[in-house]
């Protein structure tokens, strides 16, 4: 399996990437795109199924863009993810490595996400079976997920296996009410229509947040919208935060928009080892809560804290890792690009009465400078959790200048992590590697690496 989650075939030395098949399948392929060194294809006929192939559990498999590895047993999924980490570190990093620990699989492989976002659209995607029936469908509104490669089309979802089933019940109830009362769904090309998006968040504390996003251009639409919200509140009393956002823009981003409370609170909490983390409608929080806890425990263990260390937490987000390790450190300094996330980090520190954590907002390469190090002190430990693109060269250079005793590198992209490890290799030796599976049935994998100063 390739890093993108596709299977690999070879024909006359041409490498071909094929989605929705597994090693051992015997298929006829149709080339869809050909480059100099590789091609992309789709399977048009199966002659023989692989002995390791599993039966997909989701009725939307193969059309929905998510959970593409359902056709692999979970034991095979994590085996390929382990290999993906090992291949990237060795092929790209080209550095000396210790024995790589077996991947930490997810105890939950279904209903493991704490957040899903659904899209409304008046352009329902018709499946191949529906198209072949050659029937004119009266109901072309849909609520579900975008179809890959067709931004204005949405696949109507009946059941999603990623989030607790309350999510399915809420989505389907809202859909049916909107159908029955003739609510307009957004046209993603013309931007006409009322209902846009719905975000559902659950938490380890049992709280439930629903955010409904709509476009309102006339007064009577607001009254209709509030009737829908009242229906949701009456139908699902377990909702602790029912919020709404008016989005009259031409895109779905909500970070610059006001959030209104229809019922309950404007936030909920996640808990971890007695720490409480405030999660708002716009907050970032790892979407697999159980595995996030395991990931943070690994990072803390690798950091080897004794209570005397100054720790820098780079790309701190809402400060979850920083606050999580603060009780074992002398001081923690978190840096993050998004100002709103830093405000959340400060609030979380205050909620948990953490006095030894400082947070700064700004672009990492501009914030983490030699002057910053000289002003705040050389860190004993750096924990870094960058985005998929990895760390900027300037950030790597300042880390090398700071010379912390240990670096804990948390990554959602082992390829860019391997590149960065090679840049650090002159001064640092990799001492431990621990892959973690945060997203079962996808090709994505997290990896935690401990480096020590040579």
Where are these regions (language model features)?
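Short, aliphatic-rich beta-strand segments
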Residues: 200, 206-215, 276-280
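Short, conserved phosphate/pyrophosphate- and ester-handling motifs at nucleotide-, phospho-/glycolipid
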Residues: 24, 163, 288
């Amino acid at each position: 399996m390739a890093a993108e989650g596709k299977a690999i075939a070879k024909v006359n030395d041409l490498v071909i990437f094929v989605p929705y098949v597994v090693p051992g399948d015997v298929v006829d392929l149709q080339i869809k795109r050909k480059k100099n060194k590789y091609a992309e294809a789709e399977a048009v006929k199966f002659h023989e199924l692989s002995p390791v192939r599993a039966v997909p559990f989701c009725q939307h498999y193969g059309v929905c863009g998510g959970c593409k590895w359902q056709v692999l047993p979970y034991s095979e999924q994590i085996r390929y993810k382990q290999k993906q980490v090992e291949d990237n570190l060795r092929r790209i990093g080209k550095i000396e490595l210790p024995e790589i620990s077996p991947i930490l699989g997810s105890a939950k492989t279904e209903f493991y996400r704490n957040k899903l976002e659904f899209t409304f659209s008046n352009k329902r995607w018709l499946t191949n079976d529906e198209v072949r029936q050659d029937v004119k469908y009266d109901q072309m509104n849909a609520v579900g997920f975008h179809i890959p490669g067709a931004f204005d089309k949405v696949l109507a979802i009946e059941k999603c296996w990623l989030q607790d089933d309350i999510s399915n019940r809420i989505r389907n109830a809202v859909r049916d009410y909107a159908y029955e009362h003739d609510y307009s769904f957004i046209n993603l090309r013309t931007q006409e229509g009322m209902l846009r998006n719905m975000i559902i968040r659950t938490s380890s504390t049992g709280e439930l947040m629903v955010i409904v996003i709509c476009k309102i251009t006339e007064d009577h639409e607001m009254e209709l919208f509030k009737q829908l919200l009242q229906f949701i509140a009456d139908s699902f009393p377990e909702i602790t935060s029912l919020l709404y956002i008016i989005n009259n823009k031409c895109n779905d981003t909500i970070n610059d928009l006001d959030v209104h409370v229809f019922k309950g609170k404007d936030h909920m909490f996640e808990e971890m080892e007695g720490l409480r983390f405030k999660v708002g409608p716009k907050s970032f929080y790892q979407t697999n809560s159980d595995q996030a806890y395991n990931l943070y425990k690994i990072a803390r263990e690798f950091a080897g804290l004794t209570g005397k260390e100054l720790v820098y937490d780079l790309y701190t987000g809402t400060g979850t890792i920083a606050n999580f390790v603060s009780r074992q450190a002398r001081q923690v300094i978190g840096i993050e690009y998004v100002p709103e996330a830093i405000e959340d980090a400060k609030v979380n520190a205050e909620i948990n009465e953490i006095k030894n954590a400082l947070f700064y907002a700004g672009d990492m390469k501009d914030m983490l400078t030699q002057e910053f190090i000289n002003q705040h002190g050389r860190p004993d430990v750096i924990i870094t959790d960058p985005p998929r693109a990895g760390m900027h060269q300037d950030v790597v250079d300042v880390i090398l200048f700071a010379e912390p005793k240990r670096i804990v590198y948390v990554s959602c992209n082992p390829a860019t992590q391997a590149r960065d490890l090679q840049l650090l290799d002159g001064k640092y030796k990799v001492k431990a590697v621990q892959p973690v599976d945060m997203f079962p049935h996808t090709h994505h994998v997290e990896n935690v690496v401990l480096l020590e100063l040579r």
